[in-house]
Amino acid sequence: MKLFNQLRWFFVREWKRYLGAILLLIIIATLQLLPPKIVGVLIDLIIKKNMHGVQILPWILIIFLVAVIVYILRYLWRILLFGASYQLATELRVKFYTYLSQQSQIFFLKNRTGDLIARATNDVDRVVFAAGEGVLTLVDSLVMGFSVLIVMSTQISFLLTIISLIPMPIMAILIKKYGKELHETFRHAQISFSLLNNQTQEILTSIRMIRAFGLEKNQSNKFNIITRNTGKKNMEVAKIDARFDPVIYLSVAFSNLLAIIGGGWLVWNNQISIGQLTSFIMYLGLMIWPMLALAWMFNIVERGSAAWDRIHSIINKKLYIEDGKNNIPPYPGILNINIKKFYYPNNQKPSLKDIRILIKPGNTLGICGPTGSGKSTLLMLIQRQFNFKKEEIHYHSLSLLEIKIDDWRRRIAVVNQTSFLFSDTISNNISLGKPNASQKEIEEVAKLADVHKDIIDLPERYETQVGERGVMLSGGQKQRVCIARALLLNAEILILDDALSAVDAQTENNILKNINEWKKKKHSLIITTHRLSALINSDEIIVIKSGSIIQRGNHLKLIQEKNWYKSMYYYQQSEIELEDNEKTGEKNL
């Protein structure tokens, strides 16, 4: 029942629908009390020979009309009640998605995709079912049950009613006990379902790697274990679920037995008539549904409550990244970075320390360094993926923490290390951030990203479907489509996080040349790369090692000093020369 209190905000808002449904249920319950009463009266009249066959027909017609009216009214209350519950499903999923879209990187490191999908689908369905069928069964069982009890006790026999209800307290105690067991067992079953979702998602997204390494059997065994465990958990739920109906039917059977014995004694002593006893037995039959409904309601609500706890545990968490209140002036500004120390959550060792950078509009900053040195961490801080101290990063003399996140992210365009494309056309993937872009604009940025020629060679050109995660394109093509997508945003700051790793040196040179022409003193460029040739034209290059800047300057300055940059640059150049010599030798052969 706690769930209904937790959803009170929705019930209060949709009170008209729920009130309408409840009123219709009361009318239905009242109408359903008529047939047993009519049957009892008819039996007494027939026994007394005060009624003939033809006189019965109008009463039968009344019973038929009652059934038709009840059918129509049930249709109407279902529209009212389930219309409201479906609205709840929409709102919960939108709320869940909105919350996820506002979360930072750290949230998704702690919560797996499959589990989040399970909460947004299966758990929401359970909550909605409780808000629909749960409310229905609660109201229907209470209204019908109390109506029947009142008629039985006032119109027939109060004593017989008390005798017949002797098994009910025992049934109520057992149902409450099973309900508590069901809540905990169902919660474990949902956790197991989340694990199954996680495993399925991992297998489907990494199917190429699984096949490449011949891990099909290994992954199949792991999936089989998780599937069996999920089935086992659901079987435990089913076993508890299966206890409800037998308890109810045994209680009803025992109530009928007591009613027949007690009713027979009352008829023998002329305290009630045979017709009244018949009506009483029919009313007792009407009590089967309220009791079943009450047990079913406990079942539904306990499942819904367990599901709500799982949903609420996500959406009730405080956002790790809090939004600012200020808007940015509508023109490019200076990005000032002064990070003394940055620690990842629950990490004692600083990932960045003493990082001081000034990026003016139109400037290019190159970032390089060994793997794991902190380059991507710095870029994530610029994107506000993690929290930092108020004074550490400023834009337009405003701390990034004071700027509205949406406004800031509209000013930056990011191409990450891992290229991500949606299962859509190339055109729609490029125009993702600017849906109203013209075909001319799309083609212009594709040319800047040096991918236009590749696209027009495809059968359907820009309308080619790229498949799941861009599976129909090569790694280099995916990177270039992502670069085109970022360029179309025309953002003040363009960030390329090792976004040219899958293209050859000539293509890289073409793209950087086009980007340098595109930015023309209006846009800033931040580029991280392991291929140092991409940084030659940067206004400033910083070398990060173990989270600190160990060298800085432009390309000409850094190659004149004995340092990491110089040795790595000439090492890479020698590799390129060696590859060129090998290609030349192959041609001569």
Swiss-Prot record:
The keyword Transmembrane helix applies. GO terms for cellular component: plasma membrane. The keyword Membrane applies. GO terms for molecular function: ABC-type oligopeptide transporter activity; ABC-type xenobiotic transporter activity; ATP binding; ATP hydrolysis activity. Residues 334-571 form the ABC transporter domain. InterPro entries: AAA+_ATPase, ABC1_TM_dom, ABC1_TM_sf, ABC_transporter-like_ATP-bd, ABC_transporter-like_CS, P-loop_NTPase, Type_1_exporter. It is a multi-pass membrane protein. SMART domains: AAA. It holds the Pfam family ABC_membrane. It is an enzyme of class 7 (translocase). Its EC number is 7.6.2.2. Belongs to the ABC transporter superfamily. Drug exporter-2 (TC 3.A.1.117) family. This is Multidrug resistance-like ATP-binding protein MdlA. It comes from Buchnera aphidicola subsp. Acyrthosiphon pisum (strain APS) (Acyrthosiphon pisum symbiotic bacterium).
